[in-house]
C-alpha cells in the first residue's frame, strides 16, 4: 500500500444494528420461499424483451419521479437550470408529487409491474412522504421498490424507516 495515499474502507468495519439474528433468519427464510424464480424470470425478461423487440402492455419497471428538485447543485445536472425549473409539469410545481397522485399511479400499475423506482432526476429523500409511498407500493405487492439518491439525507433512523417500509 502506498504510504502517501489515504485509504478508507467502504463500510469502515461497522456492524450496523440492522444485522440482527432476527433479520438474518428472516432473510434466510425468504431465500427459500420461492421468490428467486420470480426474480430470475423478471431479470430474464429485462434482457430478452428489448433484444427481441417485444413490447408488453406494461413495462417491467416504472420510474415514478417523486421529487423534481435536489439539495445539491452538481454542474452536470439539469435540475439546477432555470429552464428546467420553469418547465416542471403541474404535479411538480412545488417540487414534489402529492401523496394522492402517487398512490393513484401505484394503484394503476400494481399487479402489472415487478419493479417501481421512486426517482428519476430529483432527490427522492427530499419528499416528505417517501417512506409512506414506499410502504404503500409494498402493500400493493410491488416486488422491488428502489430509488437513486445522493445519500445526504440518509442517517440510521431514516434508513431503518425505509427498510421497515419494504
Q: Which role fits each region the language model picked out?
A:
Residues 3-165:
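Conserved alpha-helical substructure of the radical SAM core
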Amino acid at each position: 500500500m502506498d504510504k502517501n495515499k489515504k485509504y478508507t474502507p467502504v463500510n469502515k468495519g461497522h456492524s450496523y444494528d440492522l444485522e440482527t439474528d432476527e433479520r438474518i433468519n428472516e432473510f434466510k427464510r425468504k431465500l427459500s420461499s420461492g421468490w428467486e424464480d420470480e426474480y430470475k424470470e423478471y431479470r430474464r425478461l429485462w434482457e430478452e424483451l428489448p433484444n427481441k423487440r417485444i413490447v408488453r402492455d406494461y413495462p417491467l419497471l416504472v420510474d415514478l419521479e417523486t421529487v423534481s428538485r435536489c439539495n445539491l447543485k452538481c454542474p452536470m445536472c439539469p435540475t439546477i437550470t432555470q429552464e428546467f425549473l420553469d418547465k416542471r409539469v403541474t404535479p411538480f410545481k412545488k417540487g414534489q408529487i402529492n401523496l394522492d397522485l402517487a398512490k393513484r399511479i401505484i394503484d394503476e400499475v400494481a399487479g402489472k409491474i415487478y419493479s417501481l423506482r421512486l426517482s428519476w432526476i430529483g432527490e427522492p429523500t427530499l419528499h416528505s412522504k417517501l417512506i409512506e409511498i414506499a410502504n404503500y407500493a409494498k402493500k400493493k405487492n410491488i416486488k422491488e421498490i428502489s430509488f437513486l439518491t445522493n445519500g445526504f439525507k440518509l442517517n440510521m433512523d431514516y434508513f431503518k424507516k425505509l427498510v421497515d417500509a419494504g
